[in-house]
Amino acid sequence: MAESIVEKCIERVSNRFKLVLLASQRTHDLNTGASNPIQAAKFKGHKNTIVSLHEIAGKQVDTHELFSLLVGRCKEYMKGNMNNVYSSNTSKLANLLNFSDNTDLDASQESQDYEVDGEIDDEINDQDGDEEVSV
């Protein structure tokens, strides 16, 4: 049954990758409460992904509008994501760039430098998810 729905959708949206994106956007809309009561009764018990494909195949939704909603949602995600990246890494970058070229360092200063380097390495490992596990 799902194959026939996809075949009908391909007649409307020729690119399979675009179809996946459009169905994803429509499913997101349905999950956040955008549905018609008549359609809700018709597809009761079906998952929103199947409902999305049926709507695309039946020309019940405008694919151009779905695509513009998808692009807008991606832009908002990227804008928020980029703001978080820059704000969280500013202090780390400042710590990395805050070094001195003094050659007359005493032993206590050198040990502090090694501790800071170790902390930075730990933070990098935590972000990468490559934490070392001792056995």
From Swiss-Prot:
Q: Which SUPFAM superfamilies match?
A: RPB6/omega subunit-like
Q: Which HAMAP family match?
A: RNApol_bact_RpoZ
Q: What is this protein called?
A: DNA-directed RNA polymerase subunit omega
Q: Which PANTHER family match?
A: DNA-DIRECTED RNA POLYMERASE SUBUNIT OMEGA
This chain is encoded by the gene named rpoZ
Its subunit composition reads: The RNAP catalytic core consists of 2 alpha, 1 beta, 1 beta' and 1 omega subunit. When a sigma factor is associated with the core the holoenzyme is formed, which can initiate transcription.
- Cellular component GO terms, alphabetically? DNA-directed RNA polymerase complex
Q: Which domain of life is it from?
A: Bacteria
One Pfam short name: RNA_pol_Rpb6
Query: What's in the keyword line of the UniProt record?
Result: DNA-directed RNA polymerase, Nucleotidyltransferase, Transcription, Transferase
User: What species was this sequence derived from?
Assistant: Wolbachia sp. subsp. Drosophila simulans (strain wRi)
Q: Which family does it belong to?
A: Belongs to the RNA polymerase subunit omega family.
Name which cysteines form disulfide bonds.
none
Question: Does this entry carry the keyword Disulfide bond?
Answer: no
Molecular function (GO) terms for this protein are:
DNA binding; DNA-directed RNA polymerase activity
Q: Where is this region: Disordered?
A: 107-135
Catalysed reaction(s) here are:
RNA(n) + a ribonucleoside 5'-triphosphate = RNA(n+1) + diphosphate
The UniProt regions of compositional bias labelled Acidic residues, in chain numbering, are 112-135
Chain's role: Promotes RNA polymerase assembly. Latches the N- and C-terminal regions of the beta' subunit thereby facilitating its interaction with the beta and alpha subunits.
Q: What is its EC number?
A: 2.7.7.6
- GO BP annotations, alphabetical order: DNA-templated transcription
